[in-house]
Amino acid sequence: TLFNLIAGNLKSSSGNVVFNNENITDTPSYELFSKGLLRTFQIAHEFTNLSVLENLMMVPGNQSGEKLMNALFKPSLIAKEENLIKEKAMEVVKFLNLSHLKNELAGNLSGGQKKLLELGRTMMVDAKLVLLDEVGAGVNRTLLKDLGTAIEKLNKEKGYTFCMIEHDMDFIG
């Protein structure tokens, strides 16, 4: 319920939700993305028929290619932007040790690999706060360790803040 309130999926009966000194109580969930507030879910969601790299490249919003006039009259701008997004996606797969899977269809990934991909999507927009909902659910011990290491590195090296719901106390500890 708390995550649903913060993420704009539920309306509070009283009080306010404040993020970065801004009242976001009535902000639709799709607008929170641009403010740097992201949420993951217990069951990872991905574009199953796209590769890991393509899934990451889908994340950044307001791309120049989304505007018809740019598509018609500024193809070089779109190509340049796409190259920058691809470079960032490559950095993310490397950071998460998913380079060997960058061309794999996301639908073929294991549950733990999908959770790493989901974490990678938060990296594509430099989230300020990531709400992790049972990030360890259904993940084997090996990938759970990788996931924990990635979360810790994102916090220490890149300044990400995480709020986590998790039942696996060994993972949290």
Regions picked out by a protein language model, each given a short descriptive name:
Residues 7:
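Helix-to-loop junction immediately C-terminal to a conserved catalytic motif
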Residues 15-22, 34-35:
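Conserved ABC transporter NBD signature motif
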Residues 69-101, 150-152:
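Conserved ABC ATPase "signature" region
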Residues 105-109:
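Conserved ABC ATPase signature
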Residues 134-135:
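Walker B catalytic motif
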Residues 144-158:
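Helical segment within the ABC ATPase nucleotide-binding domain
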Residues 166-167:
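H-loop/switch region of ABC-family ATPase nucleotide-binding domains
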